[in-house]
Structures are given as structure tokens and as C-alpha cells.
Amino acid sequence: MSATLIDGKAFAARVRAQVAEHVTRLKADHGITPGLAVVLVGQDPASQVYVRSKGKQTTEVGMKSVEHKLDADTSETDLLAVVDQLNKDPDIHGILVQLPLPGHLDEDLVINSIAPEKDVDGFHISNVGLLGTGQKSMVPCTPLGCLMMLRDYHGSLLGMDAVVVGRSNIVGKPMAQLLLGDSCTVTIAHSRTKDLADVVRRADIVVAAVGRPEMVPGDWIKPGATVIDVGINRLDAPEKGEGKTRLVGDVDFDSCAAVAGAITPVPGGVGPMTIACLLANTVTACCRANGLEEPEGLTA
């Protein structure tokens, strides 16, 4: 491997330390404690693990953590009532409804019922529109984490060619908007892009967020390019024992690392940044709600 490893765990720890420092100042100078509420519907094991991790990290940085755990058969009316209650609570500055929701619930309706200024996931249609027009918004956590790591590694992204492989509303599209905002020349590609390999080879920055394990091989990467791997895919790993699995990204790590200038690993790359940026967004939302200066370096 010749590429520099971009350590997401270490970077996320730095972000959490910045958040904790700002929370301490908010308490000492203004008597304000940022509050994050997470709503979980049902018993999805992966969601439960994720919500526990969010709650733990929220309290570790000194913020108020609130969890609402609802039964899987909770009605849409009852779920919307919980969100409405949180919208009106002045001690709650960030609201997150854990996805996916059970099939009988309308995810778009629920997400858009969250007050935009408390939408720390950045999924509300108002925040999507604000981001797309270059205005102040709540920025989706995973793309924000990617941008933070790119800025840290490169300094300025001015004039760089960037390819985002993936067009999801959660990662691909907002990632492209953020890169445009930093004056990159941006191409959004996807699994059906013609001559995808040639498109990717032109990029100084490749962000892979297509949801296909090890789809991007090393011979697609321009020598010296920076590769940000957003993918999290679980593959069978019989070499580890019966029923064992391993996590891989959307790029073939070994072949890409031999060519790239810098690369994020999976696990330990983008993943840890997602919750760190959720905490950062909550502090940002708290400052905006109280007319205070936003913490520097914690948003786009």
C-alpha cells in the first residue's frame, strides 16, 4: 500500500473533542445544554445498536440525550405526535428519526414533519433545497464528514475534479453539492453511467457511495487521487469460520490503495464521522436557535 490512510476514527475523535469543548462553553457562558432526541420505531437490531451508540456519544460530549422507543406497530398519527412534541420542546435542538421505518409508515412524511432547524440529519426537503442553492442549512452527516476529511487532507479543494459514484438523496446528491460549494468540478456518476471507469479515472477526488461491494477497482483510479469510500457492505468470510462475515467498502481497498494518494478504510474511515457530525450538527442547531456564533469548522 502506497496511499496515505485517512483515519476516520482519529478524525472523529477530534471532532467530538471540538464539540465537547463548545458544549462546555455553552453551559458556562450561557447556561445552555444542547439536546438531541432520537426516535426509534420497532426492534431492528442494527438500528438499536446505532441508537445506543448515538446516545452514548451524545452524553460523553456533555449534551442532553433523549430516546423515544416506540413499538413496531405504532401508528403514523402517534409517531407524528411524538415528533410534534419534540419540535415544541425548547430543550431539544436536534431531532433524529432512525431509519428505516416499518413499512406502514411514510418516511418522507415523517422526516418532513421535523422542524427544519432541528433536522440534524439534514433530510428535510427545506434543508435539501437550502443546500442545493448554497444557503445555510443543516447538512447531512455522512457527506459533511467526507467534506471535513477532504478539507483536512487537502486544505483547499479549489478547482479539483471530483467524481461522486452514487446518486442517493442521503449521500450522493448532497456530497456533490458540498463539493461544488468548495469550488470543485463535480461529476455525479452511478452504476449505469456509460464508460464509468473512464469517468472515474479523470478524478482527483473519488467519493464511492454506490452500495455495491468492491465495485471500484484500482485500475479505475487516477494515480495520486484521493479516494473516500462511503460503502459499508457485509460479505461472507468462511476463512474466519462458519457464519462469519467481513466488512468491505464500495472500492477494492488493496488495489485502490496501491494507486491512490490517500484513501479511507472500511471499517474505520467514513463511518465514525457520521455520528461525530450528528453531534456537530446538534451544537450548530443549538447555537442558531439561541442566536449565538456557530462553532468554527463543524459545518460546511
Curated annotation (Swiss-Prot):
Metabolic or biological pathway: One-carbon metabolism; tetrahydrofolate interconversion
Q: Which SUPFAM superfamilies match?
A: Aminoacid dehydrogenase-like, N-terminal domain (SSF53223), NAD(P)-binding Rossmann-fold domains (SSF51735)
Cite the EC number.
1.5.1.5, 3.5.4.9
* GO terms, biological process: L-histidine biosynthetic process; methionine biosynthetic process; purine nucleotide biosynthetic process; tetrahydrofolate interconversion
Q: Where would one find coiled-coil regions in this protein?
A: none
Which Gene Ontology cellular-component terms appear in the entry?
cytosol
* Keyword Calcium on entry: no
At the top level of its lineage, which domain of life is listed? Answer: Bacteria
A molecular function (GO) held by this record is: methenyltetrahydrofolate cyclohydrolase activity
In terms of Pfam families, this protein maps to:
THF_DHG_CYH, THF_DHG_CYH_C
Report residues binding NADP(+): 166-168, 191, 232
Keyword set, alphabetical order: Amino-acid biosynthesis, Histidine biosynthesis, Hydrolase, Methionine biosynthesis, Multifunctional enzyme, NADP, One-carbon metabolism, Oxidoreductase, Purine biosynthesis
Q: Tell me which family the UniProt entry assigns to this protein.
A: Belongs to the tetrahydrofolate dehydrogenase/cyclohydrolase family.
Q: Which HAMAP family match?
A: THF_DHG_CYH
Its biological purpose is as follows: Catalyzes the oxidation of 5,10-methylenetetrahydrofolate to 5,10-methenyltetrahydrofolate and then the hydrolysis of 5,10-methenyltetrahydrofolate to 10-formyltetrahydrofolate.
What is the protein's given name? Bifunctional protein FolD 1
Organism equals: Roseobacter denitrificans (strain ATCC 33942 / OCh 114) (Erythrobacter sp. (strain OCh 114))
Q: Which gene encodes it?
A: folD1
